[in-house]
């Protein structure tokens, strides 16, 4: 490829050799994906930390001067944690307030002995207040009353959760409070009446619900002590790399229009995994986040309710005044045009929804390009999905969208998503047509910003 220089080729060759030596290398099977603070909280479609670690370390080998990492879709904060663990300043964006809280908790190291004392104080407070409550000497006057709370939580669970929340709120320091709220958030999901291991909101079957009687306090403390170990490892790792004053900036607004502090040509590397484009169906970020966000009093903004989260994510709201031909011409992506035409023959409404996702993604790509330094690398982990039996090669579409902003696709690496059946090895990722293949593999796009000489 005409764009490759020696550094590009070295990076590609280095990772390619690892893959050639072990074709399951990027699968990271039997690898601990819960190191450091990555264990804090589950999240839909999480990028495993070993991927972010791989891309950062490879880039540092050819560009040891890099200082600032950006993740425009930070999700659970995986790339940010790995960036800090490798001595970088990190910046992330996500419109989901639960993502913001989780990422703040995971990127905030707390001195271990200080945290240990706080945990002891909190546990004592919770157990004491629980005894007082059952003796009738403590009344909880601020029980939540959000919509359908009695459908999703049993009465005794609501009482226990609010008691724990009240004890957490006694802490003055935000860092400690955020640490505890991360454990509280995951506890909320576990002790609710939702099915276990589901990201969407489905209520338990009646026969299971009848015997469902979680010990809320013990579930919460189990997560607190688990996360304490993660904080200790993270704190020591930052000491090991000399990152004594780690810098994390979390943008709570859309990555389509970044705030002023995100300057032109500011960042050295992007490591990210964008949404698949089906947040209302397959990967329901909004449904996953809703109960935790309601308990934590998290907001998207003053006008938008938390149950509308999926509507404000990329592609969540279709522009009714869209002029399709003009949009397709502007996107300048032959693949997205072909996909739109194929889907529209079957379902025009779905075709417009798919197109809207790529319109929004293009705006994000444009803004991401603005804040990236010339010659900087970007690593995008994507998965191709199927709509109306049409396979959508998102990897190719993203490459085409980037090209008009002078960001070029250098190489693609492939990894099997563990625990899923792999489609035929020879299935081409760039073939558009009648296919119905579940997302069993991911494509890692290696891209590079080029200096615009025009």
From Swiss-Prot:
Instruction: Check the record and name the InterPro entries matching this protein.
Output: MeTrfase_CN4_CS, SAM-dependent_MTases_sf
Instruction: Quote the catalytic activity from the record.
Output: a 2'-deoxycytidine in DNA + S-adenosyl-L-methionine = an N(4)-methyl-2'-deoxycytidine in DNA + S-adenosyl-L-homocysteine + H(+)
A GO BP annotation: methylation
Query: In Gene Ontology terms, what is one molecular function of this protein?
Result: site-specific DNA-methyltransferase (cytosine-N4-specific) activity
The superkingdom of the source organism is Bacteria
Q: Which UniProt keywords apply?
A: Methyltransferase, Restriction system, S-adenosyl-L-methionine, Transferase
Question: Is Membrane a UniProt keyword of this protein?
Answer: no
Is Cell division among the key words of this record? Answer: no
Task: Return the EC number.
Answer: 2.1.1.113
Record's family?
Belongs to the N(4)/N(6)-methyltransferase family. N(4) subfamily.
Query: What is the protein name for this chain?
Result: Type II methyltransferase M.MvaI
- Origin species: Kocuria varians
Question: What is the gene name?
Answer: mvaIM
């Amino acid at each position: 490829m005409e764009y490759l220089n020696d550094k590009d080729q070295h990076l590609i060759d280095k990772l390619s050799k690892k893959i050639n030596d072990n074709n399951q290398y990027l699968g990271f099977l039997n690898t601990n994906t819960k190191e450091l603070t990555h264990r804090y909280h589950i999240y839909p479609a999480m990028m495993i930390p070993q991927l972010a670690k791989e891309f950062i370390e490879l880039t540092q080998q050819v560009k040891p001067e890099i200082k600032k990492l950006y993740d425009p879709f930070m999700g659970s904060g995986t790339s940010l944690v790995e960036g800090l663990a490798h001595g970088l300043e990190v910046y992330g964006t996500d419109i989901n307030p639960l993502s913001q809280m989780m990422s703040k908790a995971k990127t905030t190291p707390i001195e271990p002995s200080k945290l240990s004392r706080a945990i002891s104080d909190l546990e004592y407070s919770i157990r004491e207040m629980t005894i007082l409550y059952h003796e009738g000497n403590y009344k909880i006057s601020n029980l939540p009353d959000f919509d359908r709370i009695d459908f999703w939580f049993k009465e005794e669970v609501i009482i226990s959760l609010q008691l724990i929340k009240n004890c957490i709120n006694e802490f003055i320091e935000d860092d400690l409070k955020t640490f505890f709220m991360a454990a509280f958030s995951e506890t909320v999901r576990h002790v609710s009446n939702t099915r276990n291991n589901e990201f969407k909101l489905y209520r338990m079957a009646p026969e299971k619900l009848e015997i469902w009687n979680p010990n809320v306090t013990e579930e919460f403390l189990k997560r607190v002590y688990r996360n304490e170990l993660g904080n200790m490892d993270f704190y020591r790792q930052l000491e090991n790399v000399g990152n004594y004053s780690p810098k994390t900036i979390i943008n709570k607004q859309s990555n389509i229009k970044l705030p002023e502090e995100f300057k032109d040509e500011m960042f050295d590397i992007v490591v990210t995994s964008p949404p698949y484009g089906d947040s209302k169906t397959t990967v329901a970020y909004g449904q996953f986040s809703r109960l935790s966000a309601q308990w934590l009093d998290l907001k998207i903004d003053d006008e938008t309710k938390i149950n509308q989260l999926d509507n404000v994510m990329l592609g969540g709201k279709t522009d009714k005044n869209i002029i399709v031909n003009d949009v397709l011409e502007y996107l300048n992506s032959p693949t997205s045009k072909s996909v739109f035409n194929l889907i529209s023959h079957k379902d025009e409404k779905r075709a417009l929804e798919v197109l809207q996702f790529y319109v929004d993604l293009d705006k994000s790509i444009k803004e991401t390009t603005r804040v990236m330094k010339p010659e900087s690398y970007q690593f995008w982990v994507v998965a191709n999905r199927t709509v109306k039996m049409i396979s959508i090669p998102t990897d190719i579409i993203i490459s085409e969208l980037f090209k008009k902003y002078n960001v070029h696709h250098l190489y693609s690496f492939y990894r099997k998503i563990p625990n899923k059946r792999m489609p035929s090895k020879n299935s081409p990722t760039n073939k558009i047509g009648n296919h119905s293949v579940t997302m069993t593999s991911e494509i890692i796009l290696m891209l590079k910003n080029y200096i615009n000489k025009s």
